Amino acid sequence: MILLYLHIYEQKGSGTLNPVAFTLFGLEIRWYGILIATGVILGLFMAYSNSKLREIEYDSVLDIILISLPIGIIGARLYYVIFQFKSYNGNIIDMINIRNGGLAIHGGLIFGCLAAYIYSRYKKLSFLKLMDIAAPSIILAQALGRWGNFFNGEAHGGPVTYSFIEKFPKFIQKGMTIDGMYYNPTFLYESTWDFVTFIILMLLIRKCKNKGVVFFGYVGLYSLGRFFIEGMRTDSLMLGPIRVAQLVSILGMLISLGFITFSYVKTKRISK
């Protein structure tokens, strides 16, 4: 169905994809929002299934998602605006408008996880157990959300030749043709990597019972893919000459490796 819309909804006369799915009572409903909402809904169903696997009440998982999600969205926008502050020229309306994109996933994860940690401590719940359940849902939502970037014509790489882009399906070629130039579809690489990570996490949650391994597995795997893909993008948030996402990804990989190593050593000691 989505592929059908990819061919139907084009900007009139331009041949490029239209980021607006439809208009409702004068309000433009964009694919970016639809895909994020779809990811959230699928994530909720996935969390319900995984809560049964880990024998945790779904109500607790749902509560933490409903609290962390809006805070995560606020954090994602705040993070993005901080690093792009000069481009807004003090325009507050543009700063809070997320309909055209501009959500930095690292900001969303930091703020969302912080909210989840505070809530779990308040309710005396295991933060790591809850995040193990949430991790597959988060990466699944990210995988779908990248297609929202596709419709917005963002999160792509640098210019490429037609001989490069012609290897991709026609609708990808169309979406990555911007102002007469072909661009590297890095959104597709990240979406694919996220789906692969989702599958790995679903296997982990069934096989590994150690608290936190699924969540930190998510942190490490996502960071690994993001580090390399970020190097190809043209719209990176920058801190001087450094790509912020690559810096955060390195930290994510180190933290993930440290936790999983610690968990493995601890399990070995207990089993002796």
Swiss-Prot record:
Entry superkingdom? Bacteria
Q: In which pathway does it act?
A: Protein modification; lipoprotein biosynthesis (diacylglyceryl transfer)
**Record-listed E.C. numbers:** 2.5.1.145
Q: Name one GO biological process term.
A: lipoprotein biosynthetic process
Topology in membrane: Multi-pass membrane protein
Key word Membrane present in the record? yes
Give GO terms: molecular function aspect only: phosphatidylglycerol-prolipoprotein diacylglyceryl transferase activity
Q: Where in the cell is it found?
A: Cell membrane
Q: Which UniProt keywords apply?
A: Cell membrane, Membrane, Transferase, Transmembrane, Transmembrane helix
Q: Which Pfam families match?
A: LGT (PF01790)
The answer, when asked if Lipid metabolism is one of the entry's keywords, is no
| Residues that bind a 1,2-diacyl-sn-glycero-3-phospho-(1'-sn-glycerol) | 146
Q: Where are the transmembrane segments?
A: 25-45, 64-84, 100-120, 185-205, 212-232, 244-264
- Record's InterPro entries? Lgt
GO CC, alphabetical = plasma membrane
Query: Member of which family?
Result: Belongs to the Lgt family.
The record's function comment reads: Catalyzes the transfer of the diacylglyceryl group from phosphatidylglycerol to the sulfhydryl group of the N-terminal cysteine of a prolipoprotein, the first step in the formation of mature lipoproteins.
The name on file for this protein is Phosphatidylglycerol--prolipoprotein diacylglyceryl transferase
